[in-house]
UniProtKB/Swiss-Prot annotation:
Record key words, sorted: Nucleus, Repressor, Transcription, Transcription regulation
Keyword Transcription: yes
Function of the molecule: Transcriptional repressor that may regulate multiple aspects of plant growth and development through the regulation of BEL1-LIKE (BLH) and KNOX TALE (KNAT) homeodomain transcription factors.
Biological process according to GO: negative regulation of DNA-templated transcription
Further information: Plants over-expressing OFP17 have no visible phenotype.
Residue ranges of domain OVATE in the record: 130-190
Taxonomic placement: Eukaryota, Viridiplantae, Streptophyta, Embryophyta, Tracheophyta
Alphabetical list of InterPro entries matching this protein: OFP17, Ovate_C
Manganese among keywords: no
Protein localization: Nucleus
Major place of residence: nucleus
Cellular component annotations (GO), alphabetically ordered: nucleus
Gene that specifies this protein: OFP17
Name recorded for this polypeptide: Transcription repressor OFP17
Amino acid sequence: MRVKATLINFKSKLSKSCNRFVSLFRFRVKRPVFIRPLRARHGNVKPRHQHHHSKKPICSCLCFLNSSKNHKMSNAKHRSSSFSVNDDDYSKFMQSPLTPATAKKLFTSPITTPYSSRTRKSLNARDTFEDNAVEDACRSFENYLIHLIVEEGKIDDLMDIEELLFCWKNLKSPVFIELVSRFYGELCRDLFSGE
């Protein structure tokens, strides 16, 4: 019984001290706050009471600061750089995001251009050589299949090929299509190349 009384006494002291602490942070509202006006309004529903505040909202001050900042930036002189830009180009550049096309025009380097074109040409030549080798190997494979079907008449191989073609038509993911194409291209090149 005595433990219960002590516990109740401790609880009341704790709650009083917490209430005092919370009262420091409590603020009083002049008008009651209702949840209904805070909810999102649908369509043309207008609030019942429109309160006009005598003070300006903070948003109008922030908008003013933002517009003056843009005005200052447009009037400011730009730094000198290795490329020349007209004033209208500079204002367009400042007001619109930098697209890759404009970045390429503005920041092209004469040193890297020939090197990049040479590497691009060598990569394209290598790709066309590999593509031609794969196409030749695939043509040899097709000729082999035609020879197999016509002369030997093996129906089991024909059914396997039809199943393979059916699975190929049902592939949807570009990653798998690329993987299967590369695998069969290399297989055809290894087995049926003319070398």
